[in-house]
């Protein structure tokens, strides 16, 4: 089992210990280590206060000092070091009203969300598991630390995280944990949509997404999320992992809607991808010739095209017509892309200025139309991408 990331962080823990404080690895990295999975981010918990951590290390960043977290920069890597803490009453089902620093590891671990995430480990790889997290991992069970209702009242996002972990790890959810989610799911309406979107993005890429997505529906989670709250999500089926952006596009096509995406507070890139996914799904069924395929591959991001094609079963499960496999398949997409004479309008050997000078015409709506006609002619092989040939083609085929 690869311990290299733990070993890279070991000097940080040892330096904290050399100064008279406790320090442990904690959270997802320990969970994944116990499961035999690849380790990613290393989180460290300690009895030292943020001020004490800053005094121990020469290069620190106070990213969340008021909450007990200091970034320690070591060998050009950032490590989150968080003081043992007990959280006070939560407000709005999403954040504690205050944080109290403590010196006891048990007190710190008991505030965490799930037993599998509440295991600490020292530099000798000894585990500190006060809540039977290893047993739950071995039994493939997601269970809250302590009383489920209390954990979800503290932070309603934990319910969505629970389903995300189920999707990623293919674990079952403990009965009492699931029942608490059923009772308290409405509390997610107090959360920021940004936090929900982060969890949904990970959930949709999980190996067991079908089960978790069905739980989202049965628990009526979508009823309390902006954008989705106006839709009958029970009609949407997800049978395999897809991007969240593709899910939103499928919803738009399935219900033939054009709702604003602003309530989801997505990035410009995400909105652009969703709109392309919608256009791709609408265009796919009509592609029956090689010329149409060339323009399709030219007009759209081939990565997104392939995502839609790979998700053919999801489209079918939502009664969305897919592609004609003899014309459009992964091989023909790659071959067509490789053979395109150009890949965007910037590659074209004429521009608007050249056209206006050649035709002795002022700019106007005609220009955009003619440039598109030239694009199509070049991509479909009707004219070569050379200025003299293009202008000759314009003289013979274009009227303004």
From Swiss-Prot:
One of its GO terms (molecular function) is CCA tRNA nucleotidyltransferase activity. Gene3D superfamilies: 1.10.246.80, Beta Polymerase, domain 2, cca-adding enzyme, domain 2. ATP binds at residues 28, 31, 112, 155, 158, 161, 164. It holds the Pfam family PolyA_pol_RNAbd. It comes from the Bacteria. Mg(2+) binds at residues 41, 43. Keywords: ATP-binding, Magnesium, Metal-binding, Nucleotide-binding, Nucleotidyltransferase, RNA repair, RNA-binding, Transferase, tRNA processing. It catalyses: a tRNA precursor + 2 CTP + ATP = a tRNA with a 3' CCA end + 3 diphosphate; a tRNA with a 3' CCA end + 2 CTP + ATP = a tRNA with a 3' CCACCA end + 3 diphosphate. It is an enzyme of class 2 (transferase). GO terms for biological process: RNA repair; tRNA 3'-terminal CCA addition. Its cofactor is Mg(2+). Transmembrane segments: none annotated. The keyword Metal-binding applies. The keyword Cell membrane does not apply. Its EC number is 2.7.7.72. CTP binds at residues 28, 31, 112, 155, 158, 161, 164. Belongs to the tRNA nucleotidyltransferase/poly(A) polymerase family. Bacterial CCA-adding enzyme type 3 subfamily. Homodimer. NCBIfam families: PRK13299.1. HAMAP family: CCA_bact_type3. Catalyzes the addition and repair of the essential 3'-terminal CCA sequence in tRNAs without using a nucleic acid template. Adds these three nucleotides in the order of C, C, and A to the tRNA nucleotide-73, using CTP and ATP as substrates and producing inorganic pyrophosphate. tRNA 3'-terminal CCA addition is required both for tRNA processing and repair. Also involved in tRNA surveillance by mediating tandem CCA addition to generate a CCACCA at the 3' terminus of unstable tRNAs. While stable tRNAs receive only 3'-terminal CCA, unstable tRNAs are marked with CCACCA and rapidly degraded. A single active site specifically recognizes both ATP and CTP and is responsible for their addition. This is CCA-adding enzyme. It comes from Staphylococcus aureus (strain Newman). The gene is cca.
């Amino acid at each position: 089992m690869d311990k290299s990331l733990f070993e890279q962080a070991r000097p940080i823990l040892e330096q904290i210990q050399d100064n008279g404080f406790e320090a442990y690895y904690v959270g997802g990295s320990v969970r994944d280590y116990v499961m035999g999975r690849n380790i990613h981010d290393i989180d460290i918990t300690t009895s030292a206060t943020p001020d004490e951590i800053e005094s121990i290390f020469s290069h620190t960043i106070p990213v969340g000092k008021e909450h007990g977290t200091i970034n320690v920069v070591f060998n050009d890597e950032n490590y989150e070091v968080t003081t043992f803490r007990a959280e006070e009453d939560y407000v709005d089902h999403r954040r504690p009203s205050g944080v109290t620093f403590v010196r006891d590891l048990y007190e710190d671990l008991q505030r965490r969300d799930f037993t599998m995430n509440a295991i600490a480990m020292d530099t000798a790889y000894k585990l500190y598991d006060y809540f039977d997290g290893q047993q739950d991992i071995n039994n493939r069970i997601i269970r809250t630390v302590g009383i489920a209702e209390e954990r979800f009242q503290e932070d309603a996002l934990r319910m969505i995280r629970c389903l995300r972990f189920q999707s990623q790890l293919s674990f079952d959810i403990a009965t009492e944990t699931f029942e608490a989610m059923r009772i308290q799911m409405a509390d997610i309406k107090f959360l920021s949509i940004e936090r929900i979107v982060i969890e949904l993005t990970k959930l949709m890429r999980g190996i067991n997404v079908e089960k978790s997505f069905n739980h989202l529906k049965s628990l009526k989670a979508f009823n309390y999320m902006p954008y989705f709250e106006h839709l009958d999500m029970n009609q949407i089926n997800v049978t395999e992992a897809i991007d969240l952006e593709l899910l939103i596009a499928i919803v738009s096509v399935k219900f033939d809607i054009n709702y604003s995406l602003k309530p989801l507070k997505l990035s410009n890139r995400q909105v652009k991808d969703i709109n392309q996914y919608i256009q791709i799904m609408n265009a796919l069924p009509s592609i029956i010739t090689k010329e149409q395929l060339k323009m399709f591959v030219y007009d759209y991001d081939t990565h997104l095209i392939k995502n839609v094609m790979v998700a053919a079963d999801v489209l079918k499960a939502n009664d969305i017509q897919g592609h004609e496999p003899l014309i459009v398949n992964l091989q023909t997409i790659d071959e067509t892309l490789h053979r395109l004479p150009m890949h965007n309008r910037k590659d074209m050997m004429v521009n608007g200025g050249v056209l206006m000078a050649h035709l002795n015409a002022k700019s106007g709506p005609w220009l955009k139309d003619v440039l598109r006609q030239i694009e199509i002619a070049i991509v479909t092989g009707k004219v070569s991408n050379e200025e003299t040939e293009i202008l000759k083609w314009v003289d013979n085929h274009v009227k303004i």
